[in-house]
Amino acid sequence: VFKHVLYIIKENRTYDQVMGDLPQGRGMKSLCIFGDSITPNQHQIAKDYLLLDNYYVSGKGSAEGHHWASAGMVTDYTEKSVRAWFRSYPHVLYDAMVYNKNGLIWNNALDHGKTVRIYGEACDFHFDGKKKYDWKTLFDKRKNNDLADFKYHSTSTISRIRPFLSQTFPGGDNETVSDQMRADDFIRELKETEANGGELPNLMVMALPNDHTAGTNPLFPTPRAMVADNDLALGRIVEAINNSKFAENTVIFVSEDDSQAGWDHISSYRTTGFVISPYNRLQKTVSTQYNQTSMLRTMEQILGLPPMNVIDATALPMFDCFSKTPDFSFKYKPRQNLIPLDEMNPIRAKLSGAALKFHDQSIKYAFQEIDKGDDDLLNKILWFSIKGKKRYPAKLAGEENEID
């Protein structure tokens, strides 16, 4: 049925943080900070296709999360060096000792004759030349159609994927770039492929990272604006696939890489996940327990690939997410953001109390760099940015030690 798989890896949210306001799922509305008004597309996709309310990540941070998401396991070395990272941070794969010897999902695809394209995953992003940009400057340049002088490239330590790594898609470890620019590039390439009579790769892996947020750093948008940016980008990508000639034989899988040890009333590992295609128009809640290895196993079966290790080999494929009867008539229409995407965090001079403290900590710990700072501290900052002085749900988060 399917010839093409698009696998989108987002950053660090729990189910209750995003979907907790949906009454048809097992959510706790009081824990929801990025609900329908901030993530209208994820909510609409859950209604139009299916809602997964029992889907889990396997790692608490991106160092483990991206390996679980792409390899279906983490190495013993990675487990034993969690939060130490003596040689380098595993997310961008500078340390060869973090690699699973059986490879990652793209190795599996290439080894079995499939075509692959990598959009921003497993790579590092670099500005060309001496000129660097901040988030607002780049956002305004895009709005004014003035990106001709914006030059950049991505690098990867994995020689196998370098020929398939997009150099026009901004690498996924840099939040200075709006996710709209990432969506722009993917949609441009999709339309060019279609116009030229080409074919999409069998496996496409995409990083869409800005729901990670940068805390309350004044050089970046507010947390809710960054999550809204990510949500709109996802909606636009789904629409583009849905309206292309590839719609009938393409399936989109969406997962967070990890939960950032965030709060959730079921589990701090529970997260958002989506399966999108004409065969997923169930319009119901699927409460079967699945996790990242289930998603990988499903992709492997769709592409005719063997499992990479014993963990994905024994994972339950996502059978309950698919119907035998497709709905080819439905065309997804993205919902527009209700939050201005360039709603910036306030500057220090306008702050006091907890807002001032969290402003300073957001800068000190550089939360715009994936998992640079303490997860639980960033969770507290995100909670405060939306909920104000309401008590932080520490007992429902993954961090045991409370930070005053």
Model-derived regions: residue spans:
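N-terminal pro-sequences and low-complexity stem/linker regions of secreted or lumenal proteins
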Residues: 1-404
